[in-house]
Amino acid sequence: MENDMETATMTQDYHIANINLADWGRKEIEIAETEMPGLMALRKKYKNAKPLKGARIAGCIHMTIQTAVLIETLMLLGAEVRWSSCNIFSTQDHAAAALAQKGIPIFAWKGETEEEYWRCIASTLEGPKGWTPNLLLDDGGDLTAHTLQKHPELCQNIRGVSEETTTGVHRLYRMLKEGSLKFPAINVNDSVTKSKFDNLYGCRESLIDSIKRATDVMIAGKRVVVCGYGDVGKGCAQSLRAYGATVYITEIDPICALQAAMEGYRVVTMDEMADSADIFVTATGNTDIITHEHMLKMKDQAIVCNIGHFDNEIDIASLQDYQWMNIKPQVDQVIFPDGKRLMVLAQGRLVNLGCATGHPSFVMSNSFTNQVLAQIELWQYPEKYPIGVYVLPKHLDEEVARLHLERVGAKLTTLTEKQADYIGVDPEGPFKSEHYRY
């Protein structure tokens, strides 16, 4: 496979696993388009205006079928793109092949090494004939950090970055505080139609899908610990309970802990549950959540996985000297000196993309419609965005939701003038204040 990829690199402006998967990828892209009404509506609305004409976007998001629909939407709106994946295991090779076959510069394949991962990101920042980006589209912050640290000369021409996920947003705010952020950023993650849909409903479906594909384990009757009760943790806990698991939550935030308790979950500590739970899921965006000491206490055949962005929530490094037995791609048994076995999924990286195909197309349409609108905002209205971290305005958040209602058979009630005046809003919205918590 590696030889095939190197040959492709020398002859084409892409680096993927297998171009022969392109037809399969194209069929799945066409199916996904029917489930992504937000992106298709933007194509229809802007196909003639081309609001991204002149934009050169370097993108770093999981190279999935749904991302392919996003990329082709950006291009139909006038942009040029170069793309890599933000995770070494998350690429769907048939999706990458379908885009590469159309001449789109894609640098991603499932199972990259760390070195190859960073080489792919670097490839998105430099193209033929002096091509460099003037916009970034990121997931997790690696592309942004790499640009700032390794290519500071590019920053003066970059109008901004739109960031997809919680982890990347945390990094942006840290960069802003430290003074190292050199261009504006739009925090797509905190759009309501992203965090309350992708993070919650997406994880509610994709976590179970990945655990089932990886292990074939019966969820019902199992004791499962979900570490973190933010939107991602909430979605995971809901699906696990729906399948019949007894769910325990660990939390640092008293508000989230109280929410979990009021939903009927037991709020516990890892130290308390390490020796008795069957499945452990980390969903915190933090580091050292499951330590080596915790794993020493776990029982034989316990399953350990992560649905946070990076691989540092579980101390995988501490297991490297033990015997690893690969069961199938991204599923390993780690055998401890005493003979105990732990099932480690996706080497502690994003389990829903390492062991399955990620979130369904419909919920990703929400997220990616926000991404397109953020890119248009940064490109069309740079004067509105000095260096800082912003969220999309409320009226655009509501518009994203509106574009998806028909697909689920939902009909809106329309305010009368009297009703709108009574609560002090425009009949067309926005309907909630900026600080409203959905």
From Swiss-Prot:
InterPro entries: Adenosylhomocyst_ase-like_sf (IPR042172), Adenosylhomocysteinase-like (IPR000043), Ado_hCys_hydrolase_NAD-bd (IPR015878), NAD(P)-bd_dom_sf (IPR036291), S-Ado-L-homoCys_hydrolase_CS (IPR020082)
UniProt keyword annotation of Hydrolase present: yes
Catalytic activity as recorded in UniProt: S-adenosyl-L-homocysteine + H2O = L-homocysteine + adenosine
Protein name per UniProt: Adenosylhomocysteinase
Free-text comment on the cofactor: Binds 1 NAD(+) per subunit.
An annotated GO BP: S-adenosylmethionine cycle
One CC-aspect GO term: cytosol
Pathway: Amino-acid biosynthesis; L-homocysteine biosynthesis; L-homocysteine from S-adenosyl-L-homocysteine: step 1/1
Intracellular or extracellular location(s): Cytoplasm
PROSITE patterns referenced in this protein's UniProt entry, alphabetically: ADOHCYASE_1 (PS00738), ADOHCYASE_2 (PS00739)
UniProt KW Cytoplasm keyword: yes
Family stated for the protein in its record: Belongs to the adenosylhomocysteinase family.
Organism: Coxiella burnetii (strain CbuK_Q154)
Cofactor(s) the protein needs: NAD(+)
Pfam name, any one: AdoHcyase
Molecular function (Gene Ontology), one example: adenosylhomocysteinase activity
SS bonds (residue pairs): none
EC number: 3.13.2.1
Main location: cytoplasm
Gene for this chain: ahcY
Keywords: Cytoplasm, Hydrolase, NAD, One-carbon metabolism
Residues the record lists as binding substrate: T64, D139, E164, K194, D198
SMART domains hit by this protein: AdoHcyase (SM00996), AdoHcyase_NAD (SM00997)
UniProt binding sites for NAD(+): 165-167, 199, 228-233, 251, 286, 307-309, 352
Known role: May play a key role in the regulation of the intracellular concentration of adenosylhomocysteine.
